[in-house]
């Protein structure tokens, strides 16, 4: 069991772009890093620092003026740590050696740059080194933020842009700890991140649900599933599996599995090896093979290690296909 790095350009938080193909929404996993969108927000936050506005309209007028007058594009911070962070935001849009070198330069400008450690950790192959780098990012962020903010802003943590490097470093650290078999530590971090930010902009709930289920902590898995109103292969198939493992074959578990089939009909085929390997894709498309491949890669072993669940899936899917063939004459008509 291992946990790959999954967010921003690999996973569940799903930075999205609209596809012109059939009105479906596609998610670019590798060629787009949504952290680049923070740059303007971060600059505006720096520009507004210390200013007081009497009304919301006054604040919006300032933001518009800042964007239109070139204040954002020409922002040159005085503080070394701000210059380092600005460089890191540019690094997020780069690839390979250029990205790494920009992160290194940012740390040369200021060691108070958690996101630079995050970039270096993401690009590191050795997992022990990943843990070390993510840990440095966490320690640096905690030192910069101070202790009071964690209690004061609990529940809204992601909404403060200065906290996001901390959240990213902790998220990465949890994944690296999981890969090292330190499941208790990984679980505590994911739970802490959801405690700080229940809205879960990062998508840590997906990792935590998977971890609960791998550890057979079904009560916590059930509670987490109930906290979020989700659609999609991850949530639907894991909900169906959890119902089977805790209650067996019931009307509720059968209904949940049928809902999962409607969410993505390719998951059973991939689980059972009835289709060949999928080509590498830069996208996750809801309901399509790339989403199914992403789910099976992360959660497939949960099904396969439970023979009864797999047999149940086969039986229910066969009946589902027969029903669709009768009503539509085609298995996968949308």
Question: What does each model-identified segment do?
Answer:
Residues 2-109, 325-334:
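Extreme N-terminal leader/anchor segments
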Residues 66-70, 75-76, 241-334:
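Long, ordered, amphipathic alpha-helical scaffolds
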Residues 79-82, 112, 158-165, 182, ...:
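Structural signature of alpha-solenoid helical repeat junctions
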Residues 116, 169, 203-204, 235, ...:
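TPR alpha-solenoid repeat register
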Residues 128-145, 191-200, 213, 223-233, ...:
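TPR/TPR-like (Sel1-like) alpha-helical repeat modules
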